[in-house]
């Protein structure tokens, strides 16, 4: 293998995101698809990962055992569900493998497990791996510092009918970026649902609204509304390949890291702007 390459393993190989990640790994220079995983009992076990993803023969067979492929990858990429990701995290921590985590919906204990593991292995953990979304998060911080103290802030997100968590991880990251810029904790100012007689809007809160419909890949808007004007900052994704390419870019970036917890803004160098 060329010195510049990094070998990746893809979790959830048969899922929508897993297939995109396989395609991206096979296409991206400097990346080698080393392993592809599916759950025990899946009808996809034994398939060629590249053919499964519609990218042509890869020579990588879909398996269910991480132990069987532990010598075939350097970085594990996981966009599955929290319980599965935490199992994979424990394995990677034990075997010194880097991780790129795009799974959302973790509770506080899950997030703490990721923080603890990052003391021993390098992890990029992000709610969204799109370059555009991460630029948007930086813009939200700037807007919040100028307008946040006097405007009503609302975050609206829309995703496909199959998404199982709400609000989306990206919407929560948007809220955290805004709250952080205002020296607040999102837990203290978030309003996640409104129904019935709610009374007037409480000043200083950050509202969230969620749409689940059709095949929407991902749309996010933050609204800063005052009397007579409002500013809206929006990102719309039209292809999951945007997220897949960002995840592979993160895996390449991790090549020089031994441990630590990072996000996509670190990968892109946005914190220096």
UniProtKB/Swiss-Prot annotation:
Gene Ontology molecular-function annotations: 4-hydroxy-tetrahydrodipicolinate reductase; NAD binding; NADP binding; oxidoreductase activity, acting on CH or CH2 groups, NAD or NADP as acceptor
Reaction(s) the record says it catalyses: (S)-2,3,4,5-tetrahydrodipicolinate + NAD(+) + H2O = (2S,4S)-4-hydroxy-2,3,4,5-tetrahydrodipicolinate + NADH + H(+); (S)-2,3,4,5-tetrahydrodipicolinate + NADP(+) + H2O = (2S,4S)-4-hydroxy-2,3,4,5-tetrahydrodipicolinate + NADPH + H(+)
Coiled coil, from the record: none
Family annotation (PROSITE patterns): DAPB
Entry binding sites for NAD(+): 12-17, 38, 102-104, 126-129
Active site per the UniProt annotation: 159, 163
Organism superkingdom: Bacteria
Enzyme Commission code: 1.17.1.8
Any single Gene Ontology cellular-component annotation: cytosol
Pfam families in UniProt: DapB_C, DapB_N
GO biological process, one term: lysine biosynthetic process via diaminopimelate
Pathway assignment: Amino-acid biosynthesis; L-lysine biosynthesis via DAP pathway; (S)-tetrahydrodipicolinate from L-aspartate: step 4/4
Keyword vocabulary terms for this entry: Amino-acid biosynthesis, Cytoplasm, Diaminopimelate biosynthesis, Lysine biosynthesis, NAD, NADP, Oxidoreductase
InterPro entries, sorted: DapB_C, DapB_N, DapB_N_CS, DHDPR_bac, NAD(P)-bd_dom_sf
Residues binding NADP(+): 39
Subcellular location: Cytoplasm
Family: Belongs to the DapB family.
Matches recorded under HAMAP family: DapB
Function of the molecule: Catalyzes the conversion of 4-hydroxy-tetrahydrodipicolinate (HTPA) to tetrahydrodipicolinate.
Subunit structure: Homotetramer.
Identification of the protein by name: 4-hydroxy-tetrahydrodipicolinate reductase
Organism: Salmonella paratyphi B (strain ATCC BAA-1250 / SPB7)
